[in-house]
């Protein structure tokens, strides 16, 4: 299992994707003041609520356009993937391991990044566009674990642990994901 932001790539992909979209549709920059206006409410809204506000720049975007941007964005990130983590990914693929990308990033582009890197399964935050503030369930921390348990075969788990699993993250938010596997690697700075 691999985390994405800060683990496979140095940056927060949400910011990178927003910049990617704004270079193609600069008018969407008008939504930045909306996000800034909600910043004082971040403690009340939480990470999921703020993610909904942040993603307002995608309001009324055609889903086919979003899919195309997601594919182009994923391809553009490939040179930025940490070589050391790419080597670990390739070694695990060569060993026949089932490769999982589990990210809190929106699934519409996380899935494309996973496809580019050859993951067997990619899970991100499912986002339903349409409303000004899109609906989503933030795929972070314990929510990642719940979704992994939901989608992976029950036979892969023993006593709540995912057998023969290796996990990689750079974030404390990824610790619940790592705790379901017996072998994990966290590079977390306090």
Protein language model features and the residues they cover:
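Short, compositionally biased "basic patch" segments
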Residues: 33, 37-63, 121-122
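Metal-dependent phosphoesterase signature
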Residues: 50-83
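Active-site neighborhood of HAD-like aspartate-dependent phosphohydrolases
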Residues: 1-45
């Amino acid at each position: 299992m691999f985390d994405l932001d800060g683990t496979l790539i140095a940056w927060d992909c949400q910011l990178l994707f927003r910049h990617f979209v704004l270079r193609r549709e600069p008018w969407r920059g008008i939504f930045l003041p909306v996000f800034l206006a909600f910043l004082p409410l971040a403690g009340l809204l939480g990470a999921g609520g703020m993610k909904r506000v942040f993603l307002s720049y995608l309001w009324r975007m055609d889903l086919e356009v979003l899919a195309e941007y997601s594919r182009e964005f994923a391809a553009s990130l490939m040179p930025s993937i940490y070589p050391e983590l790419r080597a670990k990914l390739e070694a695990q693929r060569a060993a026949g391991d089932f490769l999982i990308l589990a990210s809190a990033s929106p699934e519409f582009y996380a899935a494309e990044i996973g496809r580019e890197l050859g993951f067997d399964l990619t899970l991100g935050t499912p986002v339903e566009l349409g409303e000004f503030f899109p609906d989503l369930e933030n795929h972070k921390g314990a929510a990642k674990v719940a979704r992994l348990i939901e989608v992976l075969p029950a036979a892969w788990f023993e006593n709540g642990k995912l057998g023969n699993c290796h996990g990689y993250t750079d974030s404390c938010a990824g610790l619940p994901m790592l705790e379901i596997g017996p072998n994990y690697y966290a590079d977390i700075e306090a």
